[in-house]
Amino acid sequence: MSVESGLKTFRDADGLWENYPVQQVATHEGWEADPVLVTNFYNMLRRKCVGVKPNEGHRLVAKLEEQYEVTVVTQNVDNLHEVAGSSHVIHLHGELMKVCSSRDVENRRYWKTLTPDDCEVVPGTKAGDGSLLRPYIVFFGEAVPNISLAAHEVSEADILIIIGTSLNVYPAAGLVHYAKPNAAIYLIDPNPVVGGMLSNVHHLHKGASAGMKELSEQLMK
């Protein structure tokens, strides 16, 4: 969804992320091999993110809260949903503007939220437990800590809106199967979906902003 705001996707088809091999910057092995490189890579991503604004799709999702109880479940690591005004966001793959203990990633005592004016981490900076501060990002091969929470939210939803995902990245792609049988499910994506899609999904073949504009006009009547 953030592509329309100018941010590149988490992983391009060629296995590169901002011209870096994913194995170097988004795996535990990459972190262990060169924490300075990984720290500076995410510093660079934060600098880019700070200069980016939410697009119309983000704003329209946030606007749904005027009439609905909305939970956003996102695979994106940026904070554009929050900046746009969404108040309940579950990040599956971590949060770019947070850092954590490299020894105990989910220990909130050692989390630190960075700000636009102070978004970089000096390589070698320690967390409260003495380990290196690392990006609060779910590296490839690591468990997705919020997946159960996300599945619960999907199972409770009367309306499920899926935006800009190929439904090929698991475990997130499996969330749609937790939807209630009578839930209204909408997919906003200009590309065809290959396999695995439920028969009761309304597919809007549009980009995030254009699709959300059309759908919000229906839902906000």
Model-derived features with residue positions:
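Conserved catalytic core of sirtuin-type NAD+-dependent deacylases
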Residues: 1-221
